[in-house]
């Protein structure tokens, strides 16, 4: 497979065309961003760690019936992925209240929610990725119909039901995470983007130490060490 020109660069990855019009190469970057890229940094080796973590998680999900865009991992930082039309919604799944949720609703930080909360944000940096509801999704034509909203929520909850016990077994609490979904040329809804400490909140099961991008957001230090610890636990 030939890697051709880059046609998209996001906060954490670059996408390159290939000699197959249905396949892309996704390259993980060392860049760190927070607060809609108002805060920026760089952590050497982060791209390698996120690529390895996301590869392991996507393989786990595929084994459990979740369709993903991943075809294969071809280097320490590169994956071959199916070309998708990305649904312009960030899907957030919350098991424990923290972050923006406690600011918006006044819930005590660390409160375990009675069930997994699924929220949507509009993917629009200029607007600050605002929270939206089902009706917004329909009015803005972000989804095809109400049935697709249900499909998205069901997939999000199924992913959470697979990952929560998996990480618990690794002595990690999956506090919350965000996913992006895409539609393939066959109109199949698939998990795209990545699942990594960039997109998840992981707390140590016993100490509640943060092992994710909050270490960068909150200037806690040792970002790379936290990502390395997550990978080590996943592989053990």
Swiss-Prot record:
It catalyses: 5-amino-1-(5-phospho-D-ribosyl)imidazole-4-carboxylate + L-aspartate + ATP = (2S)-2-[5-amino-1-(5-phospho-beta-D-ribosyl)imidazole-4-carboxamido]succinate + ADP + phosphate + 2 H(+). It comes from the Bacteria. Transmembrane segments: none annotated. Disulfide bonds: none annotated. One of its GO terms (molecular function) is phosphoribosylaminoimidazolesuccinocarboxamide synthase activity. Its EC number is 6.3.2.6. Belongs to the SAICAR synthetase family. This is Phosphoribosylaminoimidazole-succinocarboxamide synthase. It comes from Campylobacter jejuni subsp. doylei (strain ATCC BAA-1458 / RM4099 / 269.97). The gene is purC.
């Amino acid at each position: 497979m030939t890697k051709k020109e880059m046609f998209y660069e996001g906060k954490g990855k670059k996408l390159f065309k290939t000699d197959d019009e249905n396949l892309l190469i996704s390259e993980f970057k060392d860049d760190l961003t927070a607060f809609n890229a108002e805060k920026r940094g760089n952590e050497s080796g982060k791209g390698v760690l996120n690529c390895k973590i996301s590869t392991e998680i996507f393989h786990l999900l595929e084994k459990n019936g979740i369709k993903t865009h991943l075809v294969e991992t071809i280097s320490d930082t590169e994956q071959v992925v199916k070309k998708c039309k990305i649904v312009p919604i960030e899907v957030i799944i919350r098991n424990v209240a923290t972050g923006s949720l406690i600011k918006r609703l006044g819930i005590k930080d660390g409160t375990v929610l009675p069930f997994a909360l699924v929220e949507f944000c509009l993917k629009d940096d200029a607007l600050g990725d605002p929270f939206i509801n089902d009706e917004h999704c329909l009015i803005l034509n972000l989804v095809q119909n109400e049935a697709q909203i249900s499909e998205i929520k069901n997939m999000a909850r199924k992913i959470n039901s697979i990952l929560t016990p998996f990480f618990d077994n690794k002595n990690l609490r999956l506090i919350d995470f965000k996913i992006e979904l895409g539609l393939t040329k066959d109109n199949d809804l698939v998990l795209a983007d990545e699942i990594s400490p960039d997109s998840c909140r992981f707390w140590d099961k016993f100490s509640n130490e943060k092992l994710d991008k909050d270490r960068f957001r909150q200037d806690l230090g040792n970002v790379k060490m936290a990502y390395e610890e997550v990978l080590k636990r996943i592989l053990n």
